[in-house]
Structure formats: C-alpha cells, structure tokens
C-alpha cells in the first residue's frame, strides 16, 4: 500500500466527514496498492477506515501476495457482504465508490452498517481535499 497516497485519502475522508470508504474500482485499488485485480462480477473491495482498520476483501479464487493491507478471503458459498460488514463500524457515514454493484450496496444497507451512504469516486475525494487546502491559503 502506498502510504503517502493512503494518507491523502484518509485526510480527505476526515475533511469530508466520511469515516469509512469502500473502493471497488480496479484502477483505484491499483492506485493505492500497486496491484491491479479484476474479479469481474465477484466482490472485491478495499475497505478504508479513518481509525486505521483497513482490509482488502476478495474471493479465495484470487489469492494475493503481500500488499500492505490485511487480505480477507471469502468463498463463493459465503455471504461476502456480511463478511465485509463484520469488519466495519456501525453507525457512520460510508463512502462507496461509484462502480460498486448495487447488489452489494443494497445488501450492506440491509445489514444496517451505515447511517448514510455517499457515492463517489476516489479522484473526487482527493480533489475535494485539494480545494479545501487551496481555500485555507
């Protein structure tokens, strides 16, 4: 995991009030981890938490080498969203990248993890931080 890039994203999350972020876009995951993974219709998500409890959740069919974040595997018979939810904090605002399939988001909402869900793109959260910094000067 690129610590400088991660720190920029975490700062942006704090400034925008997003405590947890779900990133499923392979290009965005690659940007932060240096690993390009595309599981097609299966869930893959990089979970970022302002408290530092980061996870990469992916199917067992796609084993990952060390990437600087704990990798959590699920198999095709498990409820992958429930597994992800078990690591998330309840009662916070959650940022969800714009390409995460609705079937996963709806299941997460059904599990009652977040109080609010904000659809965004990683580049948007980084650009919000840039605008905030410019306004401070």
Predicted regions, residues:
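Short, polar loop motifs at secondary-structure junctions
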Residues: 56-64, 99-106
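Short, hydrophobic beta-strand segments that form beta-sheet elements in well-ordered domains
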Residues: 21-23, 53-59, 93-97
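A short, polar/proline- and glycine-enriched secondary-structure boundary/capping micro-motif
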Residues: 7, 64-71, 106
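Short, glycine/acidic-enriched capping/hinge loops at junctions between secondary-structure elements
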Residues: 32-36, 57-60, 67-69
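Terminal domain-start leader segments
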Residues: 1-53, 89
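Short acidic-hydrophobic, aromatic-tinged amphipathic segments that line or gate anion-handling sites
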Residues: 70-81, 118
């Amino acid at each position: 995991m690129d610590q400088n890039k991660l720190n920029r994203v975490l700062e942006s999350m704090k400034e925008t009030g997003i405590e947890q972020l779900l990133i499923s876009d392979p290009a965005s995951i690659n940007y932060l981890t240096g690993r390009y993974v595309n599981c097609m219709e299966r869930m893959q998500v990089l979970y970022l938490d302002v408290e530092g409890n980061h996870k990469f959740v992916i199917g067992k069919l796609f084993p990952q080498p060390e990437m600087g974040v704990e990798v959590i595997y699920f198999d095709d018979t498990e409820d992958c969203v429930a597994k992800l939810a078990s690591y998330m904090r309840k009662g916070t605002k959650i940022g969800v990248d714009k390409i995460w399939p609705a079937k996963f988001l709806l299941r997460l909402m059904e599990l009652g993890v977040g109080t609010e869900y904000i659809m965004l793109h990683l580049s948007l959260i980084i650009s919000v931080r840039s605008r905030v910094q410019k306004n401070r000067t």
